[in-house]
Amino acid sequence: MKDCSNGCSAECTGEGGSKEVVGTFKAKDLIVTPATILKEKPDPNNLVFGTVFTDHMLTVEWSSEFGWEKPHIKPLQNLSLHPGSSALHYAVELFEGLKAFRGVDNKIRLFQPNLNMDRMYRSAVRATLPVFDKEELLECIQQLVKLDQEWVPYSTSASLYIRPTFIGTEPSLGVKKPTKALLFVLLSPVGPYFSSGTFNPVSLWANPKYVRAWKGGTGDCKMGGNYGSSLFAQCEAVDNGCQQVLWLYGEDHQITEVGTMNLFLYWINEDGEEELATPPLDGIILPGVTRRCILDLAHQWGEFKVSERYLTMDDLTTALEGNRVREMFGSGTACVVCPVSDILYKGETIHIPTMENGPKLASRILSKLTDIQYGREESDWTIVLS
């Protein structure tokens, strides 16, 4: 019995073949097959999020018998999967999302990619998918971006979205850890996440009959099942005239996340302190990369209290009655920072005075982050592709 490095033990004897079991793939073994026909690049001003893809993709196959195969950059193509693949039946899969930016100096930067690799690794363990060397995967991703670098928009309002994905591919209807898997990476040039544009406020629909995640579940992992199961509530939010779902949890209606974003409240708290608050990472909150950066920035500024704490709808409505709420905004890789203007809760529309207050803090955070992403400000939060 041998530990296959995927969070539990499994038979990994290599019977039936003489190949050595490979514990991780290596970027130095990368096989590159360039596309012979390159597609026309889109206008960066007319990009619809996630609908256009670049010329190439990265794939790495794994099996419990032989371990990792060599990584391969190849022309973008459809996958060939057995219809019994575990990802198709039992959602044995995960994904990540990060971006490459073309800076004002024409250099291409990745923003905090190590945090994405860390989160992807944790999600793989939770999904019983094989683990990998995070630095090797990141190097392979960098090589993919370099090959498709002309797809990184020449624009400071667009970027190249990077979508690593990891799926179980074993052809079996048994509910079990897969013995075969495929890791692949897609690239997509993107503009603003919301059709309303960058930094326009969104309205939220809060209904406690739906929950996004629960204690002991997978809400802190970036798994497709967390998103697919949210679509019904999202459709209901739209039917009620709102753009996103404000996910509540528990009998006290704790505020957790907004759609695909983490949530921040900038207010005067119960003790009369100026505070930036966001829900804690207790297992039901996705540990967002942008969330982490916002907390780090706020701590560096040292101008107000910064807290990871529980917030309820009663806390919010009481604060609004006392004119103690300044701003509410979501954060995420796709949107960066997104102001909140209204919440539909218990049949009533609650107005959040985010835009009336500037929003000074949300605007400041957005400006700081985008300055770093587009190279207007040097920072160790980015990796410059050489």
Curated annotation (Swiss-Prot):
One of its GO terms (biological process) is L-leucine biosynthetic process. The modification N-acetylmethionine is found at M1. The lineage of its organism: Eukaryota, Metazoa, Chordata, Craniata, Vertebrata. The keyword rRNA-binding does not apply. InterPro entries: Aminotrans_IV, Aminotrans_IV_CS, Aminotransferase-like, B_amino_transII, BCAT-like_C, BCAT-like_N, BCAT_family. This is Branched-chain-amino-acid aminotransferase, cytosolic. CDD domains: BCAT_beta_family. It comes from Homo sapiens. One of its GO terms (cellular component) is mitochondrion. It comes from the Eukaryota. The branched-chain-amino-acid aminotransferase, activity is inhibited by anticonvulsant drug gabapentin. Gene3D superfamilies: 3.30.470.10, D-amino Acid Aminotransferase, subunit A, domain 2. Keywords: Acetylation, Amino-acid biosynthesis, Aminotransferase, Branched-chain amino acid biosynthesis, Cytoplasm, Lipid metabolism, Pyridoxal phosphate, Transferase. One of its GO terms (molecular function) is branched-chain-amino-acid transaminase activity. Homodimer. The keyword RNA-binding does not apply. It is an enzyme of class 2 (transferase).
